[in-house]
């Protein structure tokens, strides 16, 4: 089943977090989901010319404002000169959704192992008539040099302008899709070429992360147990003191 399911959705709530973090139980929840979709599409279209290398966009909501975290390989292209670009973008989004928008830009330290950026880079090369084999092999080599433990790239469509569509893939290292503790980054990108559209799928294995999560959970549980014991000890001492006071009062009477 791990071969078919989306690796990101398969790991949500365990080692991966949601890109939209907010809660609402009102009937207008569908409108907010639609707004998130509009925000992401607008930001990507707005910054496409600058080639900022946007890996992902996280959205958080409060009652008063909407906070957007943009993870970019080139944060300077998002911010602009003296913050002009990011201010204009926040104002435009505020007009669209009718709420105050706050934007934070986070730099992606290793863009070579971000699946979304790898897919976009391959799509850009295919649209500029670069050989698909060369683009795929170069992307895999760069990712493995940057520290990835495994990479798999699959391209499907009229590759090289062929009349009959086909699919080809290249792989290096290991990609444990069934292992939930495996941090597998996944992205799907479409390249619009003269011959037609080419679908690009990228899997990047960055190592296991659940061991650290288990340790953190165990530490939290130990702290809670200690707090309970301390609270129980304090309550026990208080009850013993109260009993001794009652006994002394009864003896005096």
Curated annotation (Swiss-Prot):
UniProt xrefs under CDD domains: KH-II_30S_S3
Domain KH type-2 stretches: 39-109
GO annotation, cellular component aspect: cytosolic small ribosomal subunit
Positions with biased composition (Basic residues): 243-253
GO BP terms: translation
Region (Disordered): 220-253
Biased composition regions of type Basic and acidic residues, renumbered to the chain: 221-242
GO molecular function: mRNA binding; rRNA binding; structural constituent of ribosome
Family from the record: Belongs to the universal ribosomal protein uS3 family.
UniProt xrefs under HAMAP family: Ribosomal_uS3_B
Task of the protein: Binds the lower part of the 30S subunit head. Binds mRNA in the 70S ribosome, positioning it for translation.
Quaternary structure and partners: Part of the 30S ribosomal subunit. Forms a tight complex with proteins S10 and S14.
Name of this chain's protein: Small ribosomal subunit protein uS3
Source organism of the structure: Chlorobium chlorochromatii (strain CaD3)
Lineage start: Bacteria, Pseudomonadati, Chlorobiota, Chlorobiia, Chlorobiales
């Amino acid at each position: 089943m791990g071969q078919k399911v989306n690796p990101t959705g398969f790991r949500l709530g365990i080692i991966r977090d949601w890109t939209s973090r907010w809660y609402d139980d009102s009937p207008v929840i569908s409108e907010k989901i639609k707004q998130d979709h509009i925000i992401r599409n607008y930001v990507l279209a707005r910054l496409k010319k600058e080639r900022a290398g946007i890996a992902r966009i996280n959205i958080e909501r409060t009652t008063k404002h909407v906070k957007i975290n943009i993870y970019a390989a080139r944060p300077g292209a998002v911010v602009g000169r003296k913050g002009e670009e990011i201010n204009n973008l926040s104002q435009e989004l505020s007009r669209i959704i009718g709420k105050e928008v706050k934007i934070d830009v986070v730099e992606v330290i290793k863009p070579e192992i971000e699946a979304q950026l790898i897919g976009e880079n391959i799509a850009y090369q295919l649209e500029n008539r670069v050989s698909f084999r060369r683009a795929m092999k170069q992307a895999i080599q760069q990712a493995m040099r940057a520290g990835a433990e495994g990479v798999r790239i699959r391209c499907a469509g009229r590759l090289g302008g062929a009349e009959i569509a086909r699919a080809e893939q290249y792989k290096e290292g290991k990609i444990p899709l069934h292992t939930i503790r495996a941090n597998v980054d996944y992205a799907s990108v479409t390249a619009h070429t003269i011959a037609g559209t080419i679908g690009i799928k990228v899997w990047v294995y960055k190592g296991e992360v659940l061991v650290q999560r288990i340790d953190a959970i165990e530490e939290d549980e130990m702290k809670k147990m200690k707090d309970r014991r301390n609270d129980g000890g304090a309550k026990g001492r208080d009850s013993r003191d109260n009993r001794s006071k009652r006994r002394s009062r009864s003896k005096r009477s």
